[in-house]
Amino acid sequence: MSIAWYIQRFRTFSIPEILFRFHQRARTHILDKQIYKCSSKSNYSLPESSIIQNKNASFLYPIFEKNIDIFKPIDWHLDIQSEKRFPRKFSHQINIRSDEYGSAKHVWEINRLLFLTYIALQYKETNDSDFLDLFVFHVTSWVQENPYLEGVNWYSNIEINIRLINFYFCYQILNADLLRQTNSKFSEFYEKIWRPCIEKHAEFSFKHPSLFSSANNHLISEYAGLFVAACAFDIKQKEKKLIYAKKGLEREIIKQNSLEGVNREEAAEYIQFINDFFLIAAIVGQNTNHNFSENYFKQLHKIAHYLNQILDQNGNYPMYGDGDDGFVLLPDAHKHYNNFLSQLSSFAVLFKDASLKRENAIWDNKNELLFGEKGNAIFNSLESLGTPNRSSFFEKSGHFIFRKKNGNKETYLHFDAAPLGFLSIAAHGHADALSFILHVEGVPFLIDSGTFTYHTHKEWRKYFVGTLAHNTIRINQKDQATLAGPTMWLNHYDCQITSVGENFAEASHNGYKSEGVSHTRKIEFHPEEDSFTITDSLKSKKPFLAEIPFHLHPKIMVNAIGASFLLISENSRSVQIFTDTNLNY
């Protein structure tokens, strides 16, 4: 990163964080480097696998827009999108914030090892030892090609903890306790390769916490992964790590979510990702007699209700903030997997709450893995009472869902008057104050433009997080806050809810205070007419340029009719937009 970036990042630090960063730097670049230099490299011979050796065997597992063949050896350092490869050197010295080696995200997605649960399930369902051999082959290959602290796969702690969680579920699926007693080859593999790997993951997780301005979903993942590992495996300082991780989860579920159950990172796609850490920890805790507090479950219940309210009738979410298509657990090997709907079923079972079970609720392999046959029985016993049919306002958190549902017809609008994001850098927030998103019959019409990328293509990153990429107003070609790095905002705006009624909400923000402009937006819903009135008030003592974009889903067709625009979808009613005649479109 540039010197300018470091200066800006330093501005976000408190004095305690400055001390922590020095300590962290010593850990990663002095202590870790010594460990790396002194570590002996494993040189295991790869076990035989008839599936790997079979040239005709193939199974394509989705990795974003690409696939990997999990019936073949895997290059653990290759970015399959760019076909560039990350170097095998000391992990903390690798620059992931350029495209020199490609995108670390694509490499990490493979190395989360989500596909191992799928392979383990194939073994469980078929009792075919070929699948067990394939599982052992991939884990052995990973350990051999990723020595401790070598390569990009030891760079980010969140990746370490997602692997820990998947190791836990693989262990359960394989019934590894029994296998270790009955299968000498597997027992040797566990003792010499898998268990030491788990130990190193737990140690890394414990010693590399994401604290202060970085204490967002990364910290939650670290507590969750370590908690699960400490519950299930015989790791060093097991009790100490378990208590540490459990206390951390109890604290962060309150700290990182509002009293209304809204995640404070202001990144909707991350909700399903973060929820899984809290959910999985809760279930593993119950199963191992390490239960969480009543307050933990109360907050998780609120989170579940917010999740239900923000989804339209087809399970689509309003794409405010960053999204990276990340998953914690993915035993279903499908490209188009809706973890939001899967989680609703999980929460309905966990809380035995029929108000969380929708008419289109699903029971999938993930829920079967989490709850088993008993959970499925609870799921089937619940009525489907969870399909929302009216508006729901989360006023204190700044999120407003306007909704009318009648049979298969649904009008859905999300109005965002929330803070920019969480902590001093608001890493995954977008400058989208007072923006809105419109879906009809579960079809997105007016949308958030999305995320695209984090650390590469800097100009596109700046656009997609910027104000112009959202359905709000940009003043003088400037964003509502200052983007100082790919995941770092300065000069955060404040939103104020000025008026709320049964069918309307009004809010303002001060993101253009430096421009001498104030912006207030009021959204009124007329359910009898299925229409909205959106009124913007811009006040200033001097001239200014205002841009008011409307971003459409790519499948929406547009016809101009006089001063109005007709938006047409093949799968829903049409939408007509009437603009102020004084505006130039």
Language-model features, listed with the residues they occupy:
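Beta-strand-rich N-terminal accessory domains
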Residues: 9, 13, 21, 33, ...
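CBM-like, beta-strand-rich accessory domains located in the C-terminal region of large
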Residues: 161, 323, 330-333, 348-364, ...
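Residue-level detector of short, conserved catalytic/binding motifs and their immediate flanks
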Residues: 113, 161, 224, 400, ...
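Structured loops at beta-to-helix junctions and adjacent beta-edge loops in soluble globular domains
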Residues: 69, 77-81, 208, 323, ...
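Carbohydrate-active enzyme catalytic cores, enriched for enzymes
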Residues: 266-446, 498-501, 506
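Aromatic-lined, polymer-binding surfaces characteristic
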Residues: 86-88, 93-97, 103-301, 316
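Extended, charge-enriched "interface" segments that sit outside catalytic cores
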Residues: 20-98, 105-109, 153
